[in-house]
Amino acid sequence: VRYLGPERAQNMVLAALPEAVIGKGHVQSWVVGSGVPEASVEGTDGDMQRDTIAALLKHYALGSEDENKDAYDMPPIVVDAGALDLLPERVPGQVVITPHAGEMAKLLNRFETAASTAEHADSHEPYTADDVRLNPLASAKRAHELTGATVLLKGAVTMVVGTDGEGNERVILSGRAPAWMSTAGSGDVLAGMLGALLA
């Protein structure tokens, strides 16, 4: 495990996990966003973390052919919580986003607005968390379509939408989960577990 983040958190990580490596270096996967404040929350640590995450996520942005090759060569990354609003417009499938309904609504609103502007289309009705809860599969599929990312939508039924090795859409649904997964912080644990599996 390698940790890169604020010094006060580094000390807590080392106290709990002395074998953790602190600082930059080689990784097999990234997990970003857990514990990172959203853009609307100000603070020096949060700003520094967000700047670092934004710089990392730029490497995953799809664009020109050279940029695409570089993006596909990057290790898998899990983008959670406070980093979801930093997601580039188009990313490859090894980018996994893990929003809950409220975060998904914000993400869909951002990307639908960008798509409407690019296509000179009429603007869409804003999504709400309730819209996502009422149509979770359609929401997850739309997020995948707009971003290219593999989408893991957290909820009563966890929905994963991505593509298989041949580029075909793949959907996995799981309604089996322990009750503790509905408590605050369990999404951070999920992101960490997913990052470990992707490594």
Short names for language-model regions:
Residues 2-176:
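Glycine-rich phosphate/dinucleotide-binding loop and adjoining beta-alpha-beta core of small-molecule
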Residues 106-109, 183-199:
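Short, small-residue alpha-helix embedded
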Residues 179-181:
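Glycine-rich phosphate/pyrophosphate-binding beta-alpha loops
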